[in-house]
Regions:
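Membrane-proximal, proline-rich intrinsically disordered regions
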Residues: 21-76, 246
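Conserved, well-structured interaction surfaces
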Residues: 45, 49, 54, 89-163, ...
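Bacterial N-terminal signal peptides that target proteins for export
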Residues: 1-9
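Short coil/turn linking the two alpha-helices of tandem helical-hairpin repeats
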Residues: 160-162, 167, 204, 230-237
């Protein structure tokens, strides 16, 4: 009888030990980078990051856009390539770079990798902005949403400036984009900037170390002026909005 009691007691103690160990293993992550809630500034930082970063892990890993050189696919670099490298303002020594001789010689076509990288970057960024706007509208203040709408307009502006057309979407859903070109894309940009300008922060609101680089109303005014100054070019002479640049 004593042996049965001892065996039963020992088994019970072992079970209690297993339960205790199991409870101790059920712990939450203490990794400060692993969390599911984000501040407004963190959410906005991801949107602004599309202007400089090329992927999820820095210079070379998990790129947003597949290419032979991830560093070539960033917004600033890919747009700069198509805006400046064929002008007298730039002398590019590395002519062996992919597609470079066609760019600097003003003889590129749709198969040039640099033309494709810029196109894909603008499309990728716009998709990110559409997702943010869709998810956060009604949750964040209007001025924060207007900031991201400005970033989206900036990318559409470069579509207009570089390609004269864009695969257009201003929503995040499963529908395919439609093509807007010339006058239609110009008018959308004109209306969008007119709408968001009064919603954005006052000029100079972010001139401090905490918010340096964020777009305020002045950024929208500048983009709108640049759009208006080139209105006749973008619309084949159908619209001449030069007065809006004043």
């Amino acid at each position: 009888m004593k042996k049965i009691f001892i065996k039963t007691a020992m088994a019970s103690m072992l079970c209690m030990g297993f339960v205790s160990c199991a409870d101790e293993l059920n712990i939450k992550s203490v990794d400060p980078l692993n969390h599911q809630t984000y501040t407004v500034e963190e959410l906005l930082a991801k949107q602004y990051a599309t202007l400089g970063l090329t992927g999820q892990k820095g210079p070379a890993d998990l790129p947003d856009i597949k290419s032979g050189d991830e560093g070539e696919t960033g917004f600033i670099r890919s747009v700069f390539n198509l805006e400046e490298l064929m002008t007298d303002e730039t002398l590019w020594a590395y002519q062996s770079n992919d597609g470079m001789t066609q760019i600097t010689g003003m003889n590129w076509d749709k198969d040039n990798p640099r033309v494709n990288w810029a196109y894909q970057r603008l499309s990728f960024d716009i998709n990110q902005y559409n997702f943010f706007i869709s998810e956060q509208s009604g949750s964040l203040s209007e001025d924060k949403i207007a900031e991201v709408r400005f970033l989206r307009a900036l990318n559409y502006y470069y579509f207009l400036d570089l390609y004269r057309k864009a695969p257009f979407k201003d929503t995040f859903d499963n529908n395919l984009p439609t093509e807007k070109s010339g006058k239609d894309l110009y008018e959308w940009l004109d209306n969008e900037l007119t709408t968001i300008e009064p919603l954005m922060a006052e000029v100079g609101a972010y001139n401090n170390s905490q918010n340096f680089g964020r777009a305020d109303r002045g950024a929208a005014y500048a983009l709108h002026a640049r759009l208006a100054l080139n209105s006749a070019v973008y619309t084949d002479g159908q619209i001449k909005d030069y007065q809006k640049a004043i």
